[in-house]
């Protein structure tokens, strides 16, 4: 535990030294979606996805026009939505241990029940490269990479060996190089593409985050923070939305800001 604390403090010091605080070009509102939603997501093509109170997934274009919708009452409440691959949207229903994969029109491509394997207890899912999936198995306290046919390709070490406790996963996200695991009420753990533990990032108290071009973006009050896990640089950008912000999602050129009754689409282009 002492070694972990020292590493985390060193990471924090590096961030303080390299924190550039770069002021980006001023963001402007380019569209508004007058729909109440529980969550918002943006892919790298700047498509916007809203999760409604009825567990319906709505897909909009960058101008805020509704294009497609998807709902599924068979598996209960959606635990997570991963739109990092616009052609392969991954939905995870934790209560039923079920994953559903959609195409860009939000039609089902495939689905899989983790309950088929009695040894698994999946608490988080992320989309990987080459149609793979990363999952966190609470039963073995490990990250597992599954192939497109849902067979095991990679398995990390038991994280109990590192943290002396069972890791309580809240969310996972994957980039080309890394996998990030957010612990409930704690920070974000970084792993390499083989499931090897890299470090605990010096950012905590996150309600949500997303990955864009290997950069972690998260909300801090009315500011959008972008953290570069390879250079330790961090930048801050104020979101020009007067209403209380519950979530922000970053795409290629679009930032979607979720408020109680609407979603504001911002851009600096």
Task: Report residues per predicted region.
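Conserved beta-propeller blade signature
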Residues: 47-50, 88-91, 132-135, 178-181, ...
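WD40 beta-propeller blade core
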Residues: 58, 98-100, 142-144, 189-190, ...
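Repeated scaffold domains used in trafficking and secretory/extracellular systems
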Residues: 35-43, 75-83, 119-126, 164-173, ...
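A short beta-strand motif characteristic of beta-propeller blades
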Residues: 26-33, 65-71, 108-115, 152-164, ...
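Bacterial Sec-dependent N-terminal signal peptides
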Residues: 1-29, 269
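Beta-strand-rich domains and repeat architectures in extracellular enzymes and scaffolds
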Residues: 31-54
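Short loop/turn segments that connect beta-strands within beta-propeller blades
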Residues: 61-65, 103-107, 147-150, 192-196, ...
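Blade-level signature of beta-propeller repeat domains, shared across WD40, Kelch, NHL, RCC1
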Residues: 246-269
């Amino acid at each position: 535990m002492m070694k972990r604390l020292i590493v985390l403090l060193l990471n924090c010091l590096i961030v303080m030294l390299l924190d550039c605080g770069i002021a980006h070009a001023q963001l402007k509102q380019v569209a508004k979606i007058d729909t109440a939603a529980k969550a918002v997501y943006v892919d790298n093509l700047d498509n916007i996805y809203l999760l409604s109170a009825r567990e319906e997934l709505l897909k909009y274009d960058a101008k805020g026009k509704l294009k497609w919708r998807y709902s599924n009452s068979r598996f209960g409440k959606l635990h997570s939505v991963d739109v990092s691959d616009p052609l392969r949207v991954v939905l995870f229903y934790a209560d039923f241990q079920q994953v559903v994969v959609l195409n860009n029109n939000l039609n089902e491509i495939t689905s899989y029940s983790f309950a088929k394997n009695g040894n698994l207890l999946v608490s988080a899912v992320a989309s990987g490269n080459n149609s793979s999936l990363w999952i966190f198995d609470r039963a073995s306290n490990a990250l597992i990479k599954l192939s497109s046919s849902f067979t095991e390709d990679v398995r990390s070490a038991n994280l109990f060996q590192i943290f002396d406790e069972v890791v309580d996963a809240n969310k996972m996200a994957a980039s080309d190089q890394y996998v990030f695991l957010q612990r409930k009420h704690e920070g974000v753990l970084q792993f390499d593409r083989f499931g090897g533990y890299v470090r605990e990032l010096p950012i905590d108290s996150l309600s949500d985050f997303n990955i864009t071009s290997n950069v972690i973006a998260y909300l801090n009050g009315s500011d959008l923070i972008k953290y570069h896990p390879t250079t330790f640089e961090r930048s801050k950008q104020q979101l020009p939305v007067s209403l209380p912000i519950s979530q922000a999602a970053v795409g290629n050129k679009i930032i979607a800001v979720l408020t109680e009754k609407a979603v504001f689409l911002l851009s600096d282009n």
